[in-house]
Curated annotation (Swiss-Prot):
Its cofactor is Zn(2+); Co(2+). It catalyses: N-succinyl-(2S,6S)-2,6-diaminopimelate + H2O = (2S,6S)-2,6-diaminopimelate + succinate. Catalyzes the hydrolysis of N-succinyl-L,L-diaminopimelic acid (SDAP), forming succinate and LL-2,6-diaminopimelate (DAP), an intermediate involved in the bacterial biosynthesis of lysine and meso-diaminopimelic acid, an essential component of bacterial cell walls. Its EC number is 3.5.1.18. InterPro entries: Bact_exopeptidase_dim_dom (IPR036264), DapE_proteobac (IPR005941), Peptidase_M20 (IPR002933), Peptidase_M20_dimer (IPR011650), Peptidase_M20A (IPR050072). One of its GO terms (biological process) is L-arginine biosynthetic process. Binds 2 Zn(2+) or Co(2+) ions per subunit. Gene3D superfamilies: Zn peptidases. This is Succinyl-diaminopimelate desuccinylase. Zn(2+) 1 binds at residues 68, 101, 164. The active site is at 70, 135 (proton acceptor). Zn(2+) 2 binds at residues 101, 136, 350. It comes from Neisseria meningitidis serogroup C / serotype 2a (strain ATCC 700532 / DSM 15464 / FAM18).
Amino acid sequence: MTETQSLELAKELISRPSVTPDDRDCQKLLAERLHKIGFAAEELHFGDTKNIWLRRGTKAPVVCFAGHTDVVPTGPVEKWDSPPFEPAERDGRLYGRGAADMKTSIACFVTACERFVAEHPDHQGSIALLITSDEEGDALDGTTKVVDVLKARDELIDYCIVGEPTAVDKLGDMIKNGRRGSLSGNLTVKGKQGHIAYPHLAINPVHTFAPALLELTQEVWDEGNEYFPPTSFQISNINGGTGATNVIPGELNVKFNFRFSTESTEAGLKQRVHAILDKHGVQYDLQWSCSGQPFLTQAGKLTDVARAAIAETCGIEAELSTTGGTSDGRFIKAIAKELIELGPSNATIHQINENVRLDDIPKLSAVYEGILARLLAGNAV
């Protein structure tokens, strides 16, 4: 494919060092470009986070692209083969921080909109973009706040495409139609500090927690289902002791995380953890944090349309999957009837020398345009 506008826009976005939550006027660039084809822009800024809601049209159905202009830090710049914010083309790839996650996706959707509107100026429904500068950070003032605003005025989304990098081996091979929930625990096991030679005068929290730890790691939380793998329990950190070899620690800190399917609930997992700890007589404090509930878009119109657009452009059949981490889709699903994630390869995200294949860029834009055409121009699936 010879289309180069997507590449040029991606390079312009990558050249702006928008490390979370700094937007570096990326959203302003998008608004200026889309204003030319009839999009109205609404800036929704909260704290140091910039968000923008761009919309063309007032009627349903609403097809929305969601993405983020912020990127993660570069890591050691000297380890990059080229400066991370100076986009470079070499070896058939585009290099730069944000190339895969997710400035290329944003560029491709903008150019898809430009071509689609030029061909269908009186298209059905509405096209929207929800863009934030706080996805890679705390995600407290970004998409979730915009969703609150839209929900309050009953402005809902029929079909949402989140431009997260989803491809595994080749562009279009995977569509995310759901994500697992994420529930974290910060557990403090209480003991009594003492001299290691006098254990009868102390309570070792490592020892008291050990039986519960074994049970927690061996528990079958659920069996998963057609769309989700079984819920997983993983410990990320265990810390205890003073560093000395002759002191029994007074406390043990354990951090753990559930990635849970729709077969489990936040409340149910909490109850079962507390029951196991209580069963083993553990004295503890436990603080919980849930960063997202599981969500699922059943195979239907949006997945069918996306698969058809991928087949037409890429010549492959896309797999539906719910694997991987969380995304802003967990917030948008509250106002979106159907939601998928679809973008370039995820092989180098957050890494040194992050990149995308150059020949994937016009293809991704064509896939997005094909989705718009099938949803808003009556093109056959």
